[in-house]
């Protein structure tokens, strides 16, 4: 072995080296010769985006899965790409133009779109570079963009097909309207903020009845101008006698009826609601049931229109003030209450969203939703954790038609064409320039573009070449698993299942792995306004990418949120250094002539008990790792490999084997030890690689010219877990651990050598202690250890039971008993006080109901640790008391 690694682990140097080498060697391209396939498509990030903590978690999980399957010899395709992000990208470019005092409308549509493409090619896609920094093993040669020619072809084919079936239509419905951007936006782009507002109780005069009113409460009095009825519950006895009553709509010359519908909650407020079908989704549905004609009182820019009478031209919020002043002047406000309610805002600009009646393009979604429900019910698609299936079904059963048109310029233009001459209308997959009815060239395309989600719902098969029947499509569809957050189950996951079932007659993936969010250590969502946002690139630079990736996986409980605790990152950086230093120790003790041949039959016959033990411990680690992998329990996988490398391998085996590695025993024993050291390290690196790709590749490169990314997945060793050698080493480990605990509990200084007596008549204990006396003295920091079944235990002795007898640690002369007892009593008092505070906190209903579940769980873990600590301290005091 001529190669060596550096004195210190320098993450940035190692990361830059391997990012370049992997790409140069095309290490992540699928193996076309493999019989089995494994594929994942990355949820396409926005072209405007940068890597945030959610991306880092999501992509790390996917990379772990992909790297494992690649090492298992499968043809692995992890397909990257970006979403054109219609409104987000258009807003970015418009902001750039504003710096030059220009507006979008200063350009033709074609000129503006050209500018967006220029921005995309020059400044967009920053996230791609950041994904490489995270170590993502995607096949970059297959990167896709939702506006690519092939993907656009798929979009137009799907639109035409759904339109021809009557599943896409143009109609008038309530949508989320942004007056600032003057476009419809998706539900996902509406951010609901808790807002301190007012609840206005307005008197509606009964027509023809002097001084008789019905009181209706509203938070949006300006929309009252568009009321077409007031509604009560048909079972509300307060109003059943008023069935034929007509009301004077305040501030207008109109009369509106009092009607009855069961959707009204008779327990809320006065039990009456205003019906404004053009400005409220529930009112629109009620209006359709009751045969009411909507009345729109607002312009697209948020000003009041001609139907608002004297308020025409006023901004909606100015109109609110004027309406309230006029109502007050007429004595038509009964009362005003403070009211906290959720107000929808455009997440990309902050403007208050209006529920707005508009003519748009819609997908008749129920028939498609039924296909998705059937796919999940039949087991073709499995949600992990399973609890998310219930959420999925609830959403699907209450789904409404989907507004797919956006009043933007950037995006897939709706493939519908209108002839100005003969009024002929048609939908076509290809551009129409000549009317197919009259031959006129006066054909206008629809001005709107499609919702970004329309193209991204086709992502699993459009990226593989559909509608063409490509080899990629045949081999990699359906994909193996989708990894995503719960927040887009409705917006993206469900729609992908619908489209897969509709156009591929198969779901787009077999499993949907739902992970939680990353929150701050107090359980709060990361938010720029709160100021608690964590930049993953900063963390990667500070602690190393491998430490950061391992943290994300190791702290990810199934289906729950991660609480971001930066101190854990420091611990995993230490883990990286531990691996590096241990690897360096092994390499330094390998001669230039050493060749790692593994555990061959020739080596196997000369294995010593400590060798058999570490091989069995690796087998146990591998079993736990594989079991956790089958359940997507990444934290258990991380725990298994962490405990094996740090505990079994570094802290135990390397310490035990040092005399042999140093050549202080027979040459054959040294040779076997070095083969075991190197082979166990190589296999452990193979398990760790999906979590820590950079460090493992660097260390592995010393042993082999083949990159670890494509070496076979580690296998178990042919060693029995209950062999005599393994039993002896398990017993040795137990004895050393017990002695270490006794030393700690009794305050014995680390540099003080102790004398220990073992009371046991068991032959295994005797042979283990005699054969490993040197190791025992070294590992437990002992002056001596002897077996004495007749030893009489003294008052000042500390005693601990192990599986084969008792371990006695005489404390006389070793510590100042009175001083140590006082220290333990002080520590006990402090711990009991902390324990009491935590118990009070965890019995407080307010804390339990308001705190995030992860925070509550963290506090419970703290309490459990304190309870254990209190017991240990009491035991220590009891020992010292004799």
Swiss-Prot record:
* Alphabetical list of NCBIfam families matching this protein: PRK05729.1 (NF004349), valS (TIGR00422)
> One GO MF term, please?
aminoacyl-tRNA deacylase activity
Q: Name one GO biological process term.
A: valyl-tRNA aminoacylation
CDD domains with a match to the protein in the record: Anticodon_Ia_Val, ValRS_core
Which residues are listed for ATP binding in this entry? 528
- Name the keywords, alphabetized: Aminoacyl-tRNA synthetase, ATP-binding, Coiled coil, Cytoplasm, Ligase, Nucleotide-binding, Protein biosynthesis
| Domain characteristics, as noted in the entry | ValRS has two distinct active sites: one for aminoacylation and one for editing. The misactivated threonine is translocated from the active site to the editing site. The C-terminal coiled-coil domain is crucial for aminoacylation activity.
Q: Where in the cell is it found?
A: Cytoplasm
One GO cellular component term noted in the UniProt record for this chain: cytosol
Q: What is its EC number?
A: 6.1.1.9
Q: State the similarity comment.
A: Belongs to the class-I aminoacyl-tRNA synthetase family. ValS type 1 subfamily.
State the oligomer form and interacting partners: Monomer.
Q: Which InterPro entries match?
A: aa-tRNA-synth_I_CS, aa-tRNA-synth_Ia, Anticodon_Ia_Val, M/V/L/I-tRNA-synth_anticd-bd, Rossmann-like_a/b/a_fold, tRNA-bd_arm, tRNAsynth_Ia_anticodon-bd, Val-tRNA_synth_C_sf
Q: Which organism is it from?
A: Leptospira interrogans serogroup Icterohaemorrhagiae serovar copenhageni (strain Fiocruz L1-130)
Per its record, the protein catalyses:
tRNA(Val) + L-valine + ATP = L-valyl-tRNA(Val) + AMP + diphosphate
Motif residue range(s): 'KMSKS' region: 525-529
Q: Which residues form a coiled coil?
A: 812-881
Q: What is its main location?
A: cytoplasm
Q: Which domain of life is it from?
A: Bacteria
Protein name, UniProt field: Valine--tRNA ligase
**UniProt function note:** Catalyzes the attachment of valine to tRNA(Val). As ValRS can inadvertently accommodate and process structurally similar amino acids such as threonine, to avoid such errors, it has a 'posttransfer' editing activity that hydrolyzes mischarged Thr-tRNA(Val) in a tRNA-dependent manner.
User: Which SUPFAM superfamilies does the UniProt entry name for this protein?
Assistant: Anticodon-binding domain of a subclass of class I aminoacyl-tRNA synthetases, Nucleotidylyl transferase, tRNA-binding arm, ValRS/IleRS/LeuRS editing domain
**PANTHER family attached here?**
VALINE--TRNA LIGASE, CHLOROPLASTIC_MITOCHONDRIAL 2, VALYL-TRNA SYNTHETASES
